[in-house]
Amino acid sequence: MSQDPFALLKAEVDLLGRLLGEAIRTLSGERFFALVEEVRALAKARRQGDEAAGEALLARVEGLSTEEAEALVRAFTHYFHLVNLAEERHRVRVNRLRAQAETLESPRPEGFLALAKALKERGLSLEEAEAHLNRLELLLTFTAHPTETRRRTLRHHLEALQRELEAGDRERLAARVALLYGTEEVRKARPTVEDEIKGGLYYLPTTLWEAVPRVVAGLEAALERVYGRRPRLKSPVRFRSWIGGDRDGNPFVTPEVTAFAGRYAREVARRRFLEALEDLVRDLSLAEARVPVPREVRERGEGVERFMGEPYRRYFAALYRALEREEATTEGLLAALKAAERGLREVGLGRVAEAFLDPLEARLSAFGLELAPLDLREESGRLLEAAAELLRVGGVHPDFLALPQEERERLLTEELKTARPLLPVGEAPEGEALRVALGALKAWRDKGAHVVSMTHHPEDLLAVFLLAREVGLYRPGRPLPFDVVPLFETLEDLRRAPGVLRRLLENPVFLAHARGRGGVEVMIGYSDSNKDAGFLMANLALYEAQEALSRVGEEVGLPVYFFHGRGTSTARGGGPAGRAIASLPPRSVGRRIRLTEQGEALADRYSHPDLAVRHLEQMLYHFALAALGPGQEPEARWREALAQAAEESTRRYRALLQEEGFFDFFEAFTPIREIGELPIASRPVYRRGRVRDIRDLRAIPWVMAWTQVRVLLPGWYGLSALEELPLDLLREMYRGWPFFASTLEAAAMALAKADMGVARLYLRLVPEPLRFFYRRLAEEHARTVALLEAVFQAPLLHNQRTLERQIRLRNPYVDPINIVQVELLRRYRAPGGKEDEALRRALLLSILGVAAGLRNAG
């Protein structure tokens, strides 16, 4: 077989396709296999411009029974699962080839060697480079996502297929494909939060467990190649989780669920570290008669009866016993590892320490015994409601919420000067908000941060201090044992954020806390800002907010660390994470940065250790260089021009949303209501009943609905406002301003993935008087594509050829799923459709199929 990576990819896709065909024949019969082939051929012909084939395809789909439609969608969806698997293997092969080809003179772009060279070229000594890298904290926060709906059973089969492909055993491969095809894809019931916790943390003790030591070793080896000496680095990557602590809008995240999330993560971590210590007991069989041993190692192992004369085995057996009894701490285990490592290096066994102890040390510094400390997130209104009940019961104020905003802040600040609890001893809270808030704080063991969504004023955060005091976590003048993080989401809140932070840092309670914590963490939301103001304004507002918030921190002498609430779609801040970091404002990147890792993106980034290493490598490359200091400021005239265009962009976006009939069109044209009714996620889709305003919808379903119909509106609509600027100026900004270039390239991805021809099929579901909205969207799409290609002086995906090829090859196979989905929606919305369980199942499968085909859902 040819060693050309693309030839190997094509061969694997062809093989998996043939095996799927065999499974379809075996389990569904020749007649159904012929239907699949007929639909595939018609879809390809339609894609090539054959109108008759398109009409024939529509007629064929209309004539299918619900069972046939479901089976057809399942066949194409399984095809995409297999193609996605082959593409992941292709990425692994390409990564390995590029890594093998790199030299000191020609390092791989965005790699560890390129980073080491860049650090030296910027004048850093090895000691300075080592200190800089050891200061960095890249915090990746795992969140649940409604479109990561694959059952764990499917994930098991896909991972087994990876192994069968590696082994090259065609018979086992065929058997596994048959098992995959015969497995039910759709959940019978809506996933519980416990399901999401188990699924969301899956990659931490598996592929990331393998990847983290390789990241640390890769950085050390790169610095050794460039500087001539190997440094000692800890893991710059850490992990957090929201799954089981994110209470914002999710009534199913109870204090009991929060307690379960902590227990589950800690138990998973404990099992993995026990296995690692067991390996060390087995491997480090050094005899005391042959190797000098430090006193600390000898004494720690004296209580172990086995392994006489083998002090390192006894030492690690003692550590194993302490961890088994839950008497160990992360810090204690790290100190014990370092002691053993020193002992080995002192007698010339540095290689043994490097091979056997360093990987465990990297894992301990990355995961700790908590695996991923849990964040709590709650909406500010709920926290104030809880605080109001506490103040009423404690006799402080009968109606806190009726007070003016400044008076609420003053009252809380005064109250927090004392340590007294307000709830009478033994009395349970009456109100649900207070019961849940206090219950969550009590259940919260391994503390990440407490994120306050929809932060508007300082008292939104001070409410957390009051509640924490009630459960013994706050004492006046001292910092809380966790960060309290304001989350600014809407356009208005992003613009007010610098003023809110300034007032927080003037507040004695919060200032003492921030100084004790060594800085302030601020979260900025990419989803709601886009939903509120449109793509261009949201991106600019986020950029300007980071600049202004950083300046506020500088004025007070405290660093501001940003937590970027990015999604996977362009509309929600998606795209290559490394490039996104490179495009952040100068001076906004400190020694710590946090990013959300959405459930939907986890398989794409972490399904294989090699992919995980490369993803982390690219992020660390850009983060380490950005954290060195300010980059080049954009020119004032560029800022002025973009601000002007962004205002016009928002005007156009909001005019569309506010036009009479738009949300009636949206509900008819997209499967938004069905997404809310089907068992996709634990969190409700709607903030309020029917959609009459954009505020009635959560951001993820808004984006997901537009993705399903292949419009991807939130990722580009309104961008044509840039046409009001001179083309030469736009080209100059694109070449010279990384943020602007990143923004346009993200929009180009969404525009390229959109397909207005497929979207037009959904007009069958829309009443005639509302169909003009589609024509407007199609015209705006064409106009925006033309504008960006003029700015780039090249096709939309001129610098993303792999993605361009992927879209071109996938579209003919996604199209049939969309065509079937239109017919299923028509039937589902007809009288009696919602009672048809087979129809519900088929419709859900079509939503999953489009998500699998596009490799992005919202």
Curated annotation (Swiss-Prot):
Record-annotated active site: H145, K531
**PROSITE patterns, per database record:** PEPCASE_1 (PS00781), PEPCASE_2 (PS00393)
A single GO molecular function term of this UniProt record: magnesium ion binding
Q: Which GO terms describe its biological process?
A: carbon fixation; oxaloacetate metabolic process; tricarboxylic acid cycle
Where does the source fall among the domains of life? Bacteria
Entry-linked InterPro entries = PEP_COase, PEP_COase_bac/pln-type, PEP_COase_Lys_AS, PEPCASE_His_AS, Pyrv/PenolPyrv_kinase-like_dom
Cofactor(s) named in the record: Mg(2+)
The question of whether Lipid biosynthesis is a record keyword is answered with no
What Pfam families does the record point to? PEPcase
Reported EC number(s) for this entry are: 4.1.1.31
Q: Does the keyword Magnesium apply?
A: yes
Gene Ontology CC terms: cytosol
Quote the catalytic activity from the record: oxaloacetate + phosphate = phosphoenolpyruvate + hydrogencarbonate
Q: What does this protein do?
A: Forms oxaloacetate, a four-carbon dicarboxylic acid source for the tricarboxylic acid cycle.
Please name the PANTHER family in this protein's record. Answer: PHOSPHOENOLPYRUVATE CARBOXYLASE
State what protein this is by name.
Phosphoenolpyruvate carboxylase
State the organism named in the record.
Answer: Thermus thermophilus (strain ATCC 27634 / DSM 579 / HB8)
